[in-house]
Amino acid sequence: MLKKTRILSCVFLATAYGYSQAVENRVKEELPELVTIYKHLHAHPELSYYEKETAAYLAGELRSLGFAVTEQVGLYNDPEKVSYGLVGVLQNGEGPTVMVRTDLDALPVEEKTGLPYASQAMAVNENGEQVRVMHACGHDVHMTSFLGTARMLAAMKDSWRGTLVMIGQPAEERGAGARAMLADGLFTRFPKPDYVLALHAAATLPAGKIGHRPEYALANVDSVDITIRGAGGHGAWPHTTKDPIVLASQVVLGLQTIVSRQISPLDPAVVTVGSIHGGTKHNVIPDEVHLQLTVRSYKPEVRKHILDSIRQMTLGIAEAAGFPKERSPIVQVDEEEYTPATYNDPELNQRLVETFRAALGAENVVQVEPVMGGEDFGRYSLEGREIPSVIFWLGAVNPALLDEHQQTGTPLPSLHSSQFAPLPEPAIRTGVIAMTSAVLDLMK
C-alpha cells in the first residue's frame, strides 16, 4: 500500500510539473506581447463609470480567443450610468465552472513615475471637473494577467474540462461594479460559477512572489457623512451661538473611543475622520461643519455596532451641548459605496497554495496578514459564502526598491500613490502562471 501511495504521489507531482512547465513555456513566449499590452493599458486609463474603451479592448481580445463575449453587463442604481462590465464564456465540455475576474477602472491621480509609458490622460469626472487619471492601484497589471490567463487556457483546452467565465468589472474603486453586474443577472444570464478567483497587485511584495491569506483578507468599507448643524454668529460673541466647530471637535474625539473602548481588541476595526470642512473667516462662527469618515471592519456584527455607535454618539454629544432637536446632526451612511469584507474560503485557499508552490516554488508563496483595505470582489461569494472564492496578492515591487526600503527606511510608493510603478515583466509572468495554474487545477 505504501509503495502504491508513493507511486500515485509521484504521478501527481509529475502531472503537476508537466502542467507547470507547459504554462511556463507558453508564458515565456507570450510575455513580450503581454508587456506591450500592459504599457498600452497603463498609458490609457479610464475613471470608474467611464471604462468604455478599456472594456472594448478586453472584449476584442477575448473574442479573438474564441470566447462568447457580452458587453455592457451591469445595472447601477443610477439609471443614467452605463455599465461597461463584460463577460466572456469559453465552454470546453463537462466539468466545473470557474470565474476569473479583473477590474477595469483607474483613479483620479496625476502620475509622477516618470516612466516612458506614464499616463498623460485627462478626464471629466462626475462633478464636471478636469482631472488627471492613472492606474495607481494595479488594475493594469490585473487586466494584463487576466488576458494572459485567457490566452493560456484557450491554447491549452486539451488540459482542462468545464466552463471558463472571465469577467471585466467596472467601478471597483467606487464599490459599485460587482453589485451592478450581479443585479444584471451575472449568475443567471451566464453560467453560475463553482469557484471565483481574482488577484490584486501588492505594493509591499517583490515582483515574482504570491501572497495568500485564508479567511478574512480585506475589510468592510463604509463611508459616513456627518453634518453638524449649529447657529453661527460673530466670533467675538460665541455665547450667542451654537458653535458647530467646537461640537465637531468633540465628536471627532468621541469617535476615537468606539474602537478602543467598545470593540474587542481581537476584532480589527478602524474609524477615521478623513475630512473636516467648516467656516469661511477668522471671526465668523459658521452654521454647519461637515465631517467625512471611513469605517473599516470584518465581522457584520462589528460593522453594525460601529455604525450604530457613530450615530448615537454624535446625536448624544449634540444633545448634551444643548443643541436643539431641530438642529440635530445628520448622520448618513453611503450604502451605494459600501463594500463588504472579502473572505477567502480556507479550503480553496489551501488548495491554491499547493498549486502555486508547484508552479512557482515554495519560496515564492508567502502567507500575508489581512488588511483593512476594501475590495468589492467579496460580493461574488453571495450571502452565506455560497460560492468558494479566493483573491490572492501579486507581488509588484521592484526587489531593488524593496531592499533599499529595508536597509534605509526609504518609503515605498503605496497603492493609490502617484509614484506606484509595478515591475511589469516578473509581475505579469507570475500573475499569468499563478492564475492559469489555479484554473487548470480546478478544472483538471
Model-identified regions with their sequence ranges:
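Sec-dependent signal peptide recognition
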Residues: K3-C10
